[in-house]
């Protein structure tokens, strides 16, 4: 049985339990209101009676998350996910609730934690300034999603009875509409581009809807631009890898799962490594057909690359990469982004990020194929088709307007339907104002005599 003891402005629920060593212990739990204490008392008694009571556990959140990462994370995460999730834990979870006990995390604590996060300064990434002053709502959503997953395991491991993050109320996230270039601006940018690597990358991003990592991880063995392919409109690329940077810790923890190649670093003491890895989702592994012009551009680029190989000889490090540095080594995204910024400045183009070319591609394709979501999804590699409908709904709305216009011309413009005219309104009968008529007759005896003569004439007829 449990009891409630009032302590100044709070209430304690006191009960005995048997720990994992078989010893009887007493537990005091503090609650702010009598109503909360009564609810907890009933909960404890009910669980003890039906055998579902979990003994108190003093494990701290930080220790629990360490166990969670080393058991769950190692099995479920790739290296990029591992780095991202452990960064959230180190920057925004452990500093705030890491010293709390797992069993002390209640829905009320979760609500206060979210409020604290909204006032927490953003942590800068290495060599990069934070984009916002405080933690964004999008980041808070990622943090709570991670904790919801972690505490689901805590329930499974019988550390807690229920997940306090299940019904967490998140701050509203407003997704800003991305600025993108239209087709004419992209054409102008390509005309002004003088950097060969950037030129290839821009064409692949726009024509093939590729992500940056997919462009930089593309190898020549997956580029099919032979004469017979082009003649049959069957030139294509196959996306099966992406270039990214991962921490040595993630690689050591997870092994080489989903990693195709680890590039030898130029400076061996760095804490990260460039790797070629499998894309995050199965839908990202895909075949994308090439416009003929892009196929010819790639052929010319390969020819110039082969000439460079012959000139450099053994100095060229051949990793079979399509977009590579002059010595053959992988080209990181920061190099492309820097050249892209220089191009925008030189050509006086609107300021967009390189990734926006992928959004321009999706927008352009949806217009060309009149909203064919499945075909567009095949090129973009989105895991869920809903991701396209949410982001590009305005394009689909334009096509829906066109649908109404087509419906009008195809159906309602039929001459037979035009014969169905709407009913005409019947003219209303004129009414006589008797009071005004009597007044006029009194003022004009001549009018009264004329009217009397007319009435007599009508009767005679």
Q: Can you describe what each PLM-predicted range is?
A:
Residues 7-111, 303-317, 397, 412, ...:
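N-terminal DNA-binding module of tyrosine recombinases/phage integrases
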Residues 123, 130-137, 141-143, 156, ...:
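Basic, Lys/Arg- and aromatic-enriched nucleic-acid-binding interface segment
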Residues 225-236, 241-285, 294, 405-461:
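C-terminal secondary-structure termini that scaffold catalytic or DNA-interacting sites
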């Amino acid at each position: 049985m449990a009891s409630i003891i009032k302590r100044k402005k709070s209430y304690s629920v006191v009960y005995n339990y048997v720990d994992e060593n078989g010893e009887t212990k007493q537990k005091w739990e503090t609650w702010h209101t009598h109503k909360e204490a009564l609810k907890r008392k009933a909960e404890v008694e009910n669980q003890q009676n039906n055998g579902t009571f979990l003994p108190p556990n003093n494990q701290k959140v930080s220790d629990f998350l360490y166990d969670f990462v080393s058991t769950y994370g190692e099995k479920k995460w790739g290296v990029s996910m591992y780095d991202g999730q452990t960064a959230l834990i180190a920057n925004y979870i452990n500093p705030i609730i890491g010293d709390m006990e797992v069993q002390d995390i209640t829905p009320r604590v979760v609500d206060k934690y979210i409020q604290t996060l909204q006032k927490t300064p953003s942590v800068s990434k290495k060599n990069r300034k934070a984009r916002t002053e405080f933690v964004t709502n999008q980041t808070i959503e990622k943090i709570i999603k991670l904790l919801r997953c972690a505490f689901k395991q805590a329930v499974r491991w019988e550390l807690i009875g229920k997940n306090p993050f299940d019904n967490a109320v998140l701050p509203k996230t407003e997704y800003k509409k991305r600025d993108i270039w239209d087709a004419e601006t992209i054409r102008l940018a390509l005309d002004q581009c003088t950097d060969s690597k950037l030129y290839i990358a821009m064409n692949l991003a726009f024509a093939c809807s590729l992500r940056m990592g997919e462009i930089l991880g593309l190898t020549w063995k997956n580029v099919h631009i032979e004469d017979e392919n082009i003649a049959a409109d069957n030139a294509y690329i196959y996306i099966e890898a992406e270039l990214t940077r991962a921490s040595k810790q993630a690689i050591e923890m997870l092994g080489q799962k989903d990693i195709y190649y680890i590039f030898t670093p130029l400076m061996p003491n760095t804490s990260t490594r460039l790797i070629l890895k499998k894309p995050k989702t199965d839908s990202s592994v895909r075949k994308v057909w090439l416009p003929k012009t892009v196929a010819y551009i790639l052929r010319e680029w390969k020819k110039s690359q082969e000439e460079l190989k012959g000139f450099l000889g053994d100095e060229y490090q051949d990793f079979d990469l399509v977009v590579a540095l002059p010595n053959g080594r992988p080209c990181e995204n920061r190099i492309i982004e820097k050249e892209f910024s220089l191009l925008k400045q030189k050509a006086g183009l609107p300021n967009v990020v390189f990734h926006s070319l992928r959004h321009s591609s999706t927008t352009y394709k949806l217009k060309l194929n009149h909203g064919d979501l499945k075909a567009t999804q095949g090129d973009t590699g989105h895991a869920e088709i809903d991701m396209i409908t949410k982001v590009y709904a305005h394009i689909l709305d334009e096509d829906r307007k066109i649908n109404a216009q087509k419906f009008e011309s195809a159906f309602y413009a039929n001459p037979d339907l035009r014969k169905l005219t709407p009913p005409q309104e019947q003219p209303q009968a004129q009414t006589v104002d008797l009071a005004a008529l009597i007044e006029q007759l009194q003022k004009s005896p001549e009018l009264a005599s004329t009217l009397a003569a007319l009435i007599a004439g009508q009767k005679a007829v």
